[in-house]
């Protein structure tokens, strides 16, 4: 009796997971092989894990600096907040813009730094 690949697959499909695991172990022992997926060897670790470029940035006001009034005006212009909200944000510091493009983040940072603020882009 000749076993075809199809018959072998059908026989394996009828087995439980534990029985299949025992079968795999027996095949590994018999033929001296491993059922582990082959690992590709790369030239460098950096090439193996490509770095994703950040696309969304957060602009955070760290410090208002000496020109507080100018910074409040800049915060209002950038965020669209009212005078009181802009003043509170300027005094406390915090996130000005979230999930903005790199260009937008750099523009906001430039405007606020021109007004005298310390700004961080993450």
Curated annotation (Swiss-Prot):
Q: In its UniProt record, which GO terms are filed under biological process?
A: translation
Give the CC-aspect GO terms: cytosolic large ribosomal subunit
Q: What's in the keyword line of the UniProt record?
A: Ribonucleoprotein, Ribosomal protein
Keyword Ribosomal protein in annotation = yes
Q: Does the keyword Transport apply?
A: no
Q: What does this protein do?
A: Forms part of the ribosomal stalk which helps the ribosome interact with GTP-bound translation factors. Is thus essential for accurate translation.
Q: What subunit structure does UniProt give?
A: Homodimer. Part of the ribosomal stalk of the 50S ribosomal subunit. Forms a multimeric L10(L12)X complex, where L10 forms an elongated spine to which 2 to 4 L12 dimers bind in a sequential fashion. Binds GTP-bound translation factors.
Q: What is this protein called?
A: Large ribosomal subunit protein bL12
Q: Which organism is it from?
A: Xylella fastidiosa (strain 9a5c)
Q: What is the name of the gene encoding this protein?
A: rplL
